Amino acid sequence: MKIAIDAMGGDFAPENIVKGVNLAKKELSDVTFQLYGDGAKIRQFLDDETAIEIIETTEVIDFHDDPVAAIKSKKDSSLVRAVTAVKKGEADAVLSAGSTGALLTAGLMLVKRIKQVSRPALMSTLPTADGRGFDMLDLGANTENTAHHLVDFAILGSYYAENVRGIEKPRVALISNGSEESKGSPTVKEAHEILSAMTEINFIGNIESRDLLSGGADVVVTDGFTGNAILKAIEGTATVLMKEIKSAIMAGSVTTKIGGALIKKPLSGLKDLMSTDGAGGAAFVGLKAPVVKAHGNSSELAIASALKQIHKMLESDVSGKLVKHFENMDK
């Protein structure tokens, strides 16, 4: 299998991207890694060129570029060339830590959505206290969604959780302002009614945002605006929490500092639990092939995790299974 990688996308490209490939190569012996970008810069960080293809490109899409305009005008950019490789069948999947808007636009324009899926969604695996994590979608690919969009998201998320993360009968829930069936907006209530009648997924009803990190569901479905807001709140809370704990210890007495030293290992474990480095990237689900977005400031470990995530997606043929599923629904 071949994975196309935008080596020039991200805050720390190409260094962290290439070093992430070095890590992933040690575990993914059946993968050829296609690195799109400045060959000279890429080679500075490569351990060796085994299972590596370097494709020279002359342009880079910046975070401030208009996504649609950039896709059309910067056709020799590392991002566009990598996505185009998937379109042409020269690669099986694509990874980028570059512009989210540009990657989503390129995915829709070049890779194309599954015909019966009206709105693809951005989905990521987020941490929970029990270490299992949960998949949430949509995280911002769409700002407004209908009930039928949410139903599609539930199916997409359930298939991903089962086939890629190996969760048997994943519990699927809708974000709402209460767990009761009567709670929620008209859109959520309509989606709840449709999902409750479906037997192909394990729909458990509504879930409140306060229960997400305690592992109340394996797949959480919401509209893109709400999902993005929740994601940013989780990221911000985790950052502030760790910062405040450290500040409180450092500002305390000698006894407090000694206590802080004693709990350093458990705190490190908490930091690892809340870290998304091992979770992979955000998958743009609903497209005909895997398109995965890594965080702009991804570490080399996060890039390696995203590549392993893509490997699982390809190995399980989750995109192919989804295409067949939605085709059967259309009959």
Swiss-Prot record:
Keywords carried by this UniProt record: Cytoplasm, Lipid biosynthesis, Lipid metabolism, Phospholipid biosynthesis, Phospholipid metabolism, Transferase
The enzyme's E.C. designation: 2.3.1.274
Pathway membership, UniProt: Lipid metabolism; phospholipid metabolism
Family the entry assigns: Belongs to the PlsX family.
Catalytic activity from the UniProt record: a fatty acyl-[ACP] + phosphate = an acyl phosphate + holo-[ACP]
Subunit structure: Homodimer. Probably interacts with PlsY.
GO MF terms, alphabetically ordered: phosphate:acyl-[acyl carrier protein] acyltransferase activity
Predominant location: cytoplasm
A Gene Ontology term for the protein's cellular component: cytoplasm
UniProt keyword Lipid metabolism present: yes
Family matches, as Pfam families: FA_synthesis
Organism per entry: Lactococcus lactis subsp. cremoris (strain MG1363)
Subcellular location: Cytoplasm
SUPFAM superfamilies per the UniProt record, alphabetical: Isocitrate/Isopropylmalate dehydrogenase-like
Disulfide bonds: none
Superkingdom: Bacteria
Protein name per Swiss-Prot or TrEMBL: Phosphate acyltransferase
Keyword Lipid metabolism carried by entry: yes
Chain's role: Catalyzes the reversible formation of acyl-phosphate (acyl-PO(4)) from acyl-[acyl-carrier-protein] (acyl-ACP). This enzyme utilizes acyl-ACP as fatty acyl donor, but not acyl-CoA.
Gene Ontology biological process terms, A to Z: fatty acid biosynthetic process; phospholipid biosynthetic process
Gene name, Swiss-Prot/TrEMBL: plsX
Enzyme type, top EC level: transferase
